Amino acid sequence: MVKSQKVIDVLNTHYNLNLELGSIYAQYAHIADDQFSMPFLAKFIADLSNDKLGVHKNLISEYARKVEIPLHTKFSVDVNFKPANPKELIKHILDTELKVRKHVANMAKVCLEENDFETFSFVKWFVDDGIKDFDDVRTIHDFFENATNNLQVEYAIRKYLKQMKVEEEK
């Protein structure tokens, strides 16, 4: 099926968004570790980065090749957000992931408007993964909301990362 320009544009936008956020989250992981001395928070954020730069990017690239649409890399990264504390950092990531959900919803909407059910079916994976990513970030945010210090948060994140790994291996 020939893809409309609108569908090609939203796929390219999503491709570039993943490259951008993956790069930004990699920087945030360094901030979590270096500035806030929270290695488990850093690992969580680095995993988000790797998800965007790995799985997400690869899925879009493979789909673009399969359906023969061009992908254009057009992104730049300037990490000018300077969080005062780790809670502010994770709140910023939570807000960013909420924007990603809205972007993915728009991507699905465009596919349906263009009657491109093949691409809509492909986009559903990003809808599901976006729900998971947002819930994971919200969980980490909740740890900050409910803890009295960063050591408690680090311990909770460490346990959560172990739980995620066990679930992933199932």
Curated annotation (Swiss-Prot):
Q: Does the keyword Nuclease apply?
A: no
Q: Which UniProt keywords apply?
A: Iron
Q: What name goes with this protein?
A: Uncharacterized protein UU427
The Ferritin-like diiron domain sits at 1-148
Record keywords: Signal included?
Answer: no
Q: Show the InterPro entries listed in the entry.
A: Ferritin-like, Ferritin-like_diiron, Ferritin-like_SF, Ferritin_DPS_dom
Q: Which Gene3D superfamilies match?
A: 1.20.1260.10
Q: Which GO molecular function entries does the Swiss-Prot or TrEMBL record give?
A: ferric iron binding
Q: Which organism is it from?
A: Ureaplasma parvum serovar 3 (strain ATCC 700970)
Cited PROSITE patterns: FERRITIN_LIKE (PS50905)
